[in-house]
Regions:
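Cysteine-nucleophile protease catalytic domains, especially the papain-like/related folds used
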Residues: 1-27
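Exposed alpha-helical structural elements
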Residues: 6-10, 29, 33, 95, ...
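Hydrophobic, Leu/Ile/Phe/Ala-enriched alpha-helical segments that form helix-helix packing faces
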Residues: 11-15, 37-38, 256
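Active-site-adjacent substructure of cysteine-protease-like catalytic cores
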Residues: 27-77, 81
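Generic structural hydrophobic/aromatic packing signal, biased to beta-strands
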Residues: 34, 46, 79, 96, ...
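Noncatalytic regulatory segments and standalone regulatory/sensor domains
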Residues: 74-186
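Charged, long alpha-helical assembly modules
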Residues: 178-256
Length: 256
C-alpha cells in the first residue's frame, strides 16, 4: 500500500540506500527477474494479494500486502511475513504468482523491489531529525483532506456514513479492526511503531521534545487501539453507539 512503499522510500532516502522498484505485466518475466535476484543473494520485497497465500489461515482479498522473498525451490517460495502470519513462511510458486498478478483495488503489476547499500555515508542523528521533521510537516500540512490530521477528522464523520450504508456490518468492521491491529501495522494502525521509534530516537539524541513526543504517542496509540476495539464491538453487536464512540475518539486524535 501507499504507506508501506512510502515508508521504504523515506528509509532509503534518509539512510542513503538504493531503492529499486519495478513492475511488469508478464507473469513469467516477473518471476524470472525475481528469481535472478534471489540467485544472486538479494532479498526481494514483493507486493501481493494475501488471498492467494497458503499460510494465511483466513484468506481475504487485500492487494496491498508486502512480504520479503529470500529463497525458493522447485515447488515453494520462502518468505518473511508478519509475526501474525507466522514470520518465516512458505507458499507454492503457483500461489505466489497468483498473489503477485491479482487485479483489483490497491493491486500492481507484479511489483517487486530491492534495497541495496551504497557508498554514501549518513549521519544517524541527522537522519532521525530529518525523518521526524518531514513526518510532522506531512501530517500538519496534508496535500488532500484524506490524509494527515484532516484525514482523521474526515474519517470521524465517514465511519458514521459507512455504518448507515453498510450491507455487511459484521464482516466489514471486523475486517477493519483486524487490519488496524494485526495486518502488518504493528498494532494501533502503525502508531505503536512510531511510538517506539520516538523512544529509540530519544535514547540516542536525548532531546526533551522527543521525550514529550514519545509520551504523546503512548496515549495516541492507545486511542487508536480503542477505535479498533470499538469496530470489533460494532461487528458483534451492530450497535450504533460504538460507532459514535469511535467517531468521538477520532476527533480527539485529529486534534492532538
Amino acid at each position: 500500500n501507499f504507506f508501506e512503499i512510502g515508508l521504504t522510500q523515506n528509509i532509503a532516502r534518509n539512510l542513503n540506500l538504493e531503492l529499486t522498484v519495478k513492475e511488469t505485466a508478464s507473469t513469467q518475466k516477473a518471476w524470472d527477474n525475481v528469481k535472478e535476484l534471489i540467485d544472486n543473494g538479494q532479498v526481494v520485497g514483493l507486493k501481493l494479494d494475501c488471498f492467494h497465500l497458503q499460510y494465511f489461515s483466513r484468506p481475504f482479498h487485500f492487494a496491498g500486502h508486502y512480504a520479503a522473498l529470500y529463497n525458493y525451490d522447485n515447488e515453494n517460495a520462502y518468505l518473511v511475513d508478519t509475526k501474525q502470519q507466522g514470520g518465516q513462511v512458505k507458499t507454492s510458486l503457483k500461489s505466489l504468482a497468483l498473489a503477485r498478478a491479482e487485479k483489483g483495488p490497491m493491486s500492481s503489476k507484479n511489483l517487486y523491489y530491492t534495497l541495496s547499500i551504497t557508498d554514501k555515508k549518513f549521519d544517524l542523528k541527522t537522519s532521525i531529525i530529518t525523518a521526524i521533521r518531514n513526518n510532522a510537516n506531512d501530517y500538519i500540512n496534508p496535500p488532500i483532506t484524506n490524509i494527515g490530521y484532516k484525514g482523521i477528522s474526515k474519517t470521524s464523520t465517514e465511519i458514521i456514513k459507512w455504518f448507515k450504508t453498510s450491507k455487511d456490518i459484521e464482516t466489514e468492521f471486523k475486517t477493519s479492526a483486524m487490519m488496524m491491529e494485526k495486518a502488518g501495522t504493528g498494532g494501533a494502525l502503525f502508531r505503536n511503531l512510531y511510538r517506539d521509534f520516538l523512544k529509540e530516537s530519544y535514547d540516542i539524541l536525548k532531546l526533551d521534545k522527543l521525550k514529550s513526543g514519545h509520551e504523546a504517542f503512548v496515549e495516541i496509540a492507545e486511542l487508536w487501539t480503542s477505535v479498533s476495539q470499538l469496530f470489533e464491538k460494532v461487528s458483534q453487536t451492530k450497535d450504533f453507539k460504538y460507532i459514535q464512540q469511535a467517531s468521538d475518539i477520532l476527533k480527539i486524535i485529529s486534534n492532538k
